[in-house]
Amino acid sequence: MKIQCNVCEAAEATVLCCADEAALCWACDEKIHAANKLAGKHQRVPLSASASSIPKCDICQEASGFFFCLQDRALLCRKCDVAIHTVNPHVSAHQRFLLTGIKVGLESIDTGPSTKSSPTNDDKTMETKPFVQSIPEPQKMAFDHHHHQQQQEQQEGVIPGTKVNDQTSTKLPLVSSGSTTGSIPQWQIEEIFGLTDFDQSYEYMENNGSSKADTSRRGDSDSSSMMRSAEEDGEDNNNCLGGETSWAVPQIQSPPTASGLNWPKHFHHHSVFVPDITSSTPYTGSSPNQRVGKRRRRF
């Protein structure tokens, strides 16, 4: 791409005058800047990419200038450009151009050491190694002895029961899902497990409809006598109550009539019966079906 000279508008521009803000060819540049000494001091930037000389920064006069600020009309290096155009929002809005022939590349950013490093072999071993808590030697020996004793008890088919004193402990046979397997009476099991506060005849009254063979089988224990006495008392109460505890509404028969209909069979025991007086002849029969003797004819 070629830039046309702003003065003659015919030749190719070779320099850019920062003071005049114009692109000039070699002929126009010599003609304009040779007129007086003041014009000869104008800063001019070559537009040819093959130019080997790079002008210095107008601020520090040490580093090479890469940026041209249109408002300040000065060539600036990177350091001076940042220092000047970051003071306030007004100067940061200045238009700046990159000089011709300057190649721009991405600046490598040093990110520094990574905060999250890859896990080392030591970290991996620490993650995979299980946590083991150190146990004192006496406690460890006691724990091993207790664990070994529990294994032996499980192999023998017994489970530890309640402790009678500090040295000895009772052992109960294993209980299956159905019933107990062993010769220990039921009352001993209830005392061991603290079930003596319950009613001892609860199971017996629950199974009251079973056969008498269960009662004779429970006669071996001391509680069977209490169960039998409770059964006898229950039978006496049933006999006194008539054997039935259901409620019934008493039925009152219809009142008797003069014709003998609806007369009770045992009216002298009936509390509701009121006899009807129909004639002067005294009634001596005990039932309504009894016939009164015929009157004798008088001759």
UniProtKB/Swiss-Prot annotation:
It holds the Pfam family zf-B_box. Disruption phenotype: Increased hypocotyl length under short day conditions. Delayed chloroplast development. GO terms for molecular function: zinc ion binding. It comes from the Eukaryota. Zn(2+) 2 binds at residues 57, 60, 80, 85. InterPro entries: B-box_zinc_finger, CONSTANS-like_Bbox1, Znf_B-box. A zinc finger (B box-type) spans 5-47, 57-99. Zn(2+) 1 binds at residues 5, 8, 28, 33. Induction: By light. It is found in: Nucleus. Keywords: Activator, Metal-binding, Nucleus, Repeat, Transcription, Transcription regulation, Ubl conjugation, Zinc, Zinc-finger. Residues 164-181, 251-260, 277-290 have a biased composition (Polar residues). Residues 143-181, 206-299 are annotated as: Disordered. Interacts with HY5. This is B-box zinc finger protein 22. It comes from Arabidopsis thaliana (Mouse-ear cress). The lineage of its organism: Eukaryota, Viridiplantae, Streptophyta, Embryophyta, Tracheophyta. The gene is BBX22.
